[in-house]
Amino acid sequence: MQFTDVHNIYSDSRSKVALQRIKEVLNVEKPDLVIITGDIIYGKPAEEGFREVLGLVSDFQIPFGITFGNHDDEQGMTRKQLFDIASSFEYNLTTTAEGVSGFSNYILTVRSNDNTKDAAILYCMDSNTYSTIKNIEGYGFINFDQIEWYRENSKKFTSANGGNPVQSFAFFHIPIPEYSYAVEDQNAVMTGTRMEQVCAPKLNSGMFAAMKEMGDIKGIFVGHDHDNDYAVYWNNILLAYGRYTGGNTVYNHLSNGARVIELSEDGTSFTTWITLEKGERINKAVCPDDFIKD
């Protein structure tokens, strides 16, 4: 399950609906894993607000991981400090690769039912904050060393699987530029809601190209754009937004909820949908079957 953009502010009544929805959706779906793709907090005190969200998930005794968004370290604590707080929770799976840009680059492996092999690989990545390139404004991007980290690990999993790529999925906060290319492609099939333009970085650092080169990524799941929850199938990869999870501490025009991703062990397909208030499920789709034009 993916939560995104909780934008929690501790002791702010506008965040109450976000915390309620997290609890409600967890009760309904009972997921095996939760990944929160950034912008978890949106005000001070940072530690209390951060602990409130992670503690809520942890209390369900569900393993969880996080990736950072561009607003998380704007509330008086650094990514490293927030990472250390996350590490204090019993059910936290978040780690970070040493020597790689960011503080939430890690891999989660999903084992086969008989526990003999890796059935799926989840790449969780820090999409960073804002551009650090001179004269280039806007949002940050996945850096070259992060892309190389992904490529090298992908090669290892493929090699261990007899030269066949293992079905893999990527989770991070800021959408890559290909989200814009995909919705402009009239041949690409889309499901869900698109109410704002893609707020991607101005520079394309090549993450999608690396994914195509490795041949393992089946789906990408991001947040950042609160009024989008669509999924579009482009060049054999599903580019999907999570559903905005937050309350009214920041702009939003969609009722809040979560995205659910259900994997199949054989890797031929996966199913995804949005879960809302009272367990309502919408936009259920099987990928790739429901995204192929007749």
PLM region descriptions:
Residues L26, V57, M211-K212:
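Short hydrophobic patches on amphipathic alpha-helices
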Residues M1-E52:
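N-terminal active-site segment of His-dependent metallophosphoesterases
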Residues D5, I22, V34, D39, ...:
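Divalent metal-coordination and catalytic microenvironments
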Residues M1-Y10, A119-T129, F171, L238-Y244:
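Active-site-proximal beta-strand elements of phosphoester/diester hydrolases
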Residues I9-S11, Y42-P45, I66-M77, Y130-I133, ...:
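Active-site environment of divalent metal-dependent phosphoester hydrolases
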Residues K30-D32, I121-Y123, I136-D229:
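His/acidic metal-ligating clusters that form di-metal
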Residues I107-S112, T116, L122, M207-M214, ...:
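Binuclear metal-dependent phosphoesterase catalytic core
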Residues R51-G163, R259-S264:
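Extended active-site neighborhood of metal-dependent phosphoesterases/phosphodiesterases
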